[in-house]
């Protein structure tokens, strides 16, 4: 598997709608200030976080069970900023909608700007022929509240081209997160 370049990313986004909306270059400045960068980089694409958040709370003293997740464990927030409580986490989604080609697998890594503040961004790989908004998981590993900025960069997607096309894609097996929009909670 080889990593795909900025030229390939731009071509696939423009000709095949692989990323929508798409920013063909790296954006580092907003209207009046600097932003955490997003858009096409040399060998990846830096995604933005939308303004839709689900902040984890334990007001119901629930047990976290991935097979039976209680959605009442979250507080919904629509805002340009999300404050994650100490030692807690929040879910969000990307601004961008992805359509992954059949011969590509992506790996997503959190941006160092957040990691250096103790904020870990986790995203599972985007599998061949998966499509949707990416659900982002933010973990605040610090004993202090942590801030996430909507519409700014949060993670980088790396596109790995396969040497051989897979027999069964995510779409073929009707993956449970296929076509997801909005912030999607765990499904068992």
UniProtKB/Swiss-Prot annotation:
- Establish whether keyword Ion transport is in the entry: no
Against CDD domains, the record matches this protein to: trimeric_dUTPase (cd07557)
Gene Ontology terms describing biological process: dUMP biosynthetic process; dUTP biosynthetic process; nucleobase-containing small molecule interconversion
Pathway listed: Pyrimidine metabolism; dUMP biosynthesis; dUMP from dCTP (dUTP route): step 1/2
Q: What is its EC number?
A: 3.5.4.13
A GO molecular-function descriptor: dCTP deaminase activity
Instruction: Show the active-site residues.
Output: 137 (proton donor/acceptor)
The catalytic activity, as recorded, is: dCTP + H2O + H(+) = dUTP + NH4(+)
Record: residues binding dCTP: 111-116, 135-137, 156, 170, 180
Designated name of the protein: dCTP deaminase
Tell me the disulfide pairings in this chain. Answer: none
EC primary class = hydrolase
Record function comment: Catalyzes the deamination of dCTP to dUTP.
Q: Which HAMAP family match?
A: dCTP_deaminase
